[in-house]
Amino acid sequence: DLHFAPTIRNRDNLLREGLPAERIFVTGNTVIDALLQVADKPYEFQDEVLSKIDFAAKRVITVTCHRRENLGEYMDNIFGAIGQIAREFPDVEVVYPVHLNPKVREAARRHLGKISNVHLIQPLTYQPFVRLMAGSYLVITDSGGMQEEAPALGKPVLVVRRETERPEAVEAGTVKLAGVERETIYEMARTLLTDPSAYQAMAKAVNPYGDGHACRRIIDVLKRGEFDAE
């Protein structure tokens, strides 16, 4: 077997499991290749709400929140912080493709449904969602994949969880753990909206999950045949 590890940490984990170093190659994650290919394609939003947002004039915050461990008090805190930010910054447009879980939808409507610059929309397919991320100023999420994808587009990510399975992102500075307390989430988002240096530090940090060339590196390894084929 060959092992194409997205990150150095992934490689080190494989080594600790006893896998031979000569069969492990750090390539980046192929999902970033796919993301950047989609992001480069021309696309016009079909969604009525998204088609009316002036992404050049507004600072768009993309939100996703769906994890079961956040249901209840934590989700109330998260949505409360997002609502507070939306009310304080009239140049911000919050876009939240709401998960289909009825409990998530109820909480979202209760906290955010009456705020004029918060848009609760239906879930998006991949291409429009990538375009939404690409046009965003900031991402607030409890999703795992977005912690890898949004930084590839130069977007800071606040993770509304107590922990993350993507520690490389935190170490690289592309992601910050905002936790699940309302005041902390609010303050961290506010900092990114008011402190250009803090924003740029995250936006320009190098994404540890790849640069869009993982597939090429994998192909190069296979072509070179620098491994035992048996």
Across the structure, where does each feature detected by a protein language model lie?
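Nucleotide-activated sugar donor-binding and catalytic core shared by glycosyltransferases
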Residues: 1-96, 101-230
